[in-house]
Swiss-Prot record:
Protein function: Catalyzes the hydrolytic dehalogenation of small (S)-2-haloalkanoic acids to yield the corresponding (R)-2-hydroxyalkanoic acids. Active with 2-halogenated carboxylic acids and converts only the S-isomer (or L-isomer) of 2-chloropropionic acid with inversion of configuration to produce R-lactate (or D-isomer).
Organism lineage: Bacteria, Pseudomonadati, Pseudomonadota, Gammaproteobacteria, Pseudomonadales
One annotated GO molecular function: (S)-2-haloacid dehalogenase activity
Assigned EC number: 3.8.1.2
Site features described as Important for catalytic activity, chain residue numbers: T14, K151, Y157
Record protein name field: (S)-2-haloacid dehalogenase H-109
Classification via NCBIfam families: HAD-SF-IA-v2, HAD_type_II
Organism superkingdom: Bacteria
Length: 224
C-alpha cells in the first residue's frame, strides 16, 4: 500500500449509527421500533441501488421516505404525514458510533485531510454532521447529489478523488458497508472495512486492504 495522504469516510453506518432511529420508531409504533429500523434501512439501500440501475436518480431524502412507506405497509402499520415527517427527521439526527469522535480527533491531529462521501444529499450530510457538532473534522462533505447516481457507482468514488485532489492509491476509503467497500476497492482505493458486526465480506472479486472492528482500531493501524 502506498503512503496514505487523505481519508474518505462513508457516513451512514460507518461514522453514524443508522439504527439510532430505533427510539423514534418505537415512540411512533410501540413494540415495532427494531423491526421498522431494520427493514427501513434494507429498503433504503435497495431503493438507492435500483435508482442507479434504472437511471432514475432522486434525492436520498425521497428514497428514504419511500422506503419508510414500504416498511410501514409491509408491517401493517397505519401512517400519516406527520409521523412520516417526524421519522424522516430522525435520519438527520443520527448518533455517532461511540468510537467515532475519539478516532476522528486523533486522525485530525495527524494532519491528514478528511472527507465524507455519502449517498446522502448535501442537506442531509450537513444536518447530520452539524447536529452532532462534527464539522471540525472534515475538509469536504461530498454528496452523490453532484453526480446524481448512488454508490457504489464509480462516478461517486471518482468525485471523491477529484475533490480531495489526491491520487486514488493514496486515498484511504473507510466504510462499514461491505457493498460500499467493494465498490471503492474496485475503483482503486485502498479500503479499510469497519466490520462492527463480525459479518462476512461480499464475494464480488475484491477484498479490503484492512479489516478492523471499529474506528479506534482503524486509527491505531493507520497512525501507529
Amino acid at each position: 500500500m502506498q503512503p496514505i495522504e487523505g481519508i474518505v469516510f462513508d457516513l451512514y453506518g460507518t461514522l453514524y449509527d443508522v439504527h439510532s432511529v430505533v427510539q423514534a420508531c418505537e415512540s411512533a409504533y410501540p413494540g415495532q421500533g427494531e423491526a421498522i429500523s431494520r427493514l427501513w434501512r434494507q429498503k433504503q439501500l435497495e431503493y438507492t441501488w435500483l435508482s442507479s440501475l434504472m437511471g432514475r436518480y432522486a434525492s436520498f431524502e425521497q428514497r428514504t421516505e419511500e422506503a419508510l412507506r414500504y416498511t410501514c405497509k409491509h408491517l401493517g402499520l397505519a401512517t400519516d404525514e406527520t409521523t412520516l415527517r417526524q421519522l424522516g427527521q430522525a435520519y438527520l439526527h443520527l448518533a455517532p458510533h461511540p468510537d467515532t469522535t475519539a478516532a476522528l480527533r486523533r486522525l485530525k491531529a495527524s494532519g491528514l485531510p478528511m472527507a465524507i462521501a455519502s449517498n446522502g444529499s448535501h442537506h442531509s450530510i450537513e444536518q447530520v454532521v452539524s447536529h452532532s457538532d462534527m464539522g471540525w473534522a472534515f475538509d469536504h462533505l461530498i454528496s452523490v447529489e453532484t453526480v446524481k447516481v448512488f454508490k457504489p457507482d464509480n462516478r461517486v468514488y471518482s468525485l471523491a478523488e477529484q475533490t480531495m485532489a489526491i491520487p486514488r492509491d493514496r486515498l484511504l476509503f473507510v466504510s462499514s458497508n461491505s457493498w460500499d467497500a467493494t465498490g471503492a476497492r474496485h475503483f482503486g482505493f485502498p479500503v479499510c472495512w469497519v466490520n462492527r458486526q463480525g459479518a462476512v465480506f461480499d464475494e464480488l472479486g475484491a477484498t479490503p486492504t484492512r479489516e478492523v472492528r471499529d474506528l479506534g482500531e482503524m486509527s491505531d493501524w493507520l497512525l501507529d
